[in-house]
Regions:
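Short, solvent-exposed loop/turn at the beta-strand->alpha-helix junction
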Residues: 108-111, 133-134
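Leucine-rich solenoid repeat scaffolds
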Residues: 117, 125-141
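Mid-chain, well-packed structural core segment of small domains
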Residues: 89-95, 109
């Protein structure tokens, strides 16, 4: 049985969310506004988040199986300067595979990231300094 590494599945708070933009037709938008006016939802965002969570729940088994098959970290994974220095000392190159949020500490120099990170695959959000992202540009998928 494959190992599934759960880091954190807690929902992000406030500033930890990513903004997306969607295009809706006027009829769909009108129906959303009607449901908000009638008190079913507190606002448009509440309805959209609820709908997305419901769809994710429908497909939860597929997500779990795929995360296991792809050997991905589910949740949050953070790499500190010390983590990357330890990998460098051990002559290891990291393949980062995350469904959720992957982040590299702000104090990580681009040279260290380039020397220790072989690839980055993130389904979700990837936070790193612009210099680190530039150093890893050819390795981010």
């Amino acid at each position: 049985m494959a190992n599934l590494k759960l880091i954190s599945t807690s929902r992000p708070k406030g500033g930890e969310t990513e903004k997306i933009t969607i295009n809706l037709g006027p009829i769909d938008l009108g129906q959303i506004d009607l449901l908000v006016e009638e008190g079913f939802y507190s606002n448009r965002t509440d309805l959209i988040r609820t709908a997305i969570r419901n769809q994710l729940a429908v497909h939860a088994q597929v997500v779990t199986e795929t995360v296991t098959r792809r050997a991905m970290v589910l949740g949050l994974q953070h790499f500190s300067r010390q983590d990357l220095e330890a990998a460098q000392t051990a002559n290891e190159r990291l393949d980062i595979h995350v469904l959720g949020l992957a982040s590299i500490a702000a104090d990580v120099p681009p040279e260290l990231a380039a020397a220790t990170i072989a690839s980055v695959v993130v389904l979700g959000a990837f936070h790193a300094s612009p210099a680190v992202k530039a150093a890893l540009a050819g390795r981010i998928r």
